[in-house]
Design a protein with these regions (language model features):
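Bacterial N-terminal signal peptides that target proteins for export
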Residues: 1-9
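Hydrophobic alpha-helical targeting segments used for export or membrane insertion
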Residues: 10-14
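N-terminal signal peptide c-region/cleavage motif recognized by signal peptidases
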Residues: 17-19
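Residues within mature, well-folded domains
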Residues: 22-104
């Protein structure tokens, strides 16, 4: 019986040690997930290393193609032992989180 309990505890600990999925990221002791506000992310993670506009071309009412800002891509670098994270934000909300290469 004791052996089964040890195995169960070990299994739970191993599952808890698995990194968060690609639609979430850990900042210090906080977790950021898709749908969180950018204000919440700034409080938990601080300023990103880089902010880039995401644009796309759209046709306006006069038939002209214009470049429209669609959102932003924020880059977080948590150091050389961690993966960089690319966070897409739009209208003040996190809409996507992607893993990048190892940080510097």
């Amino acid at each position: 019986m004791n052996r089964y309990m040890n195995n169960a505890v070990l299994t739970v600990l191993l599952l808890l040690s698995i990194p968060a999925s690609a639609d979430a990221m850990r900042c210090k002791n906080a977790l950021i997930t898709e749908g969180d506000s950018t204000a919440e992310m700034l409080l938990k993670c601080g300023e990103p290393m880089l902010r880039e506009d995401i644009t796309r071309n759209e046709e306006n009412q006069y038939g002209n193609v214009v470049e429209v800002k669609y959102g932003e891509r924020w880059t977080y670098n948590f150091g050389k032992n961690e993966f960089m994270r690319f966070v897409t934000v739009r209208n003040g909300k996190v809409i996507d989180i992607e893993n990048g290469p190892r940080g510097e």
